[in-house]
């Protein structure tokens, strides 16, 4: 009897020392912040061993896999999170991001639409959906999403730049030039923006002097695609 009590006491001690589900999850998040993604995944798997219904652990594991560029595995993990609980925008948004990286733009838009329906206050959804719509060449819808982003933050240089690309695709060089000017004012190191600005000024408006100045700026910033334009059109 004493021996049995001894083993019961030992087991109780072991169980009391075992980390809880929340402690394991929190450690996984800490490892994520430290960019130790594989170790984080191991902790999220331990959470799921304790509780296979933990939707947050599936979502967090998916984020860690995404950071490792394991997009298919990330999509699988986000899908499991959604299957457990479809009331949060996060796994839909995150799965959309994985589809975006895979250039599966249509699937990305569907997930972003669902995420947006669950929480319309998340500006990142509009920006990333704009990128996916740009990839689908749905330029007017992309412009709408980038405008929503810019209403909240007019100084978002990437939103200005991608709006310009959508405007060019939508055959609006006037609007594109305005957005590109806004871009280079906000980010003077964006060689691609100077390049697009220069090309548009020259090809759409015949502004050779201004266009060449911007193409040369793009080249100076290391944007090599500008070289052929500078060589062909900007030599004195």
Give the ranges of each region predicted by the language model.
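Helix-start (N-cap) detector for alpha-helical repeat units in TPR-like alpha-solenoids
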Residues: 21-22, 55-56, 89-90, 123-124, ...
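Alpha-helical segment of the N-proximal tetratricopeptide repeat
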Residues: 22-56, 60-63, 67, 97
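Bacterial Sec-dependent N-terminal signal peptides
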Residues: 1-27
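Structural signature of tandem alpha-helical TPR/SEL1-like repeats
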Residues: 34-42, 68-80, 102-114, 135-148, ...
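Canonical tetratricopeptide repeat
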Residues: 60-63, 67, 94, 128-131, ...
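Structural marker of alpha-solenoid helical repeat scaffolds
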Residues: 50, 84, 118, 152, ...
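Terminal, low-structured helical/coil segments at or just beyond the last alpha-helical repeat
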Residues: 17, 23, 195, 199-236
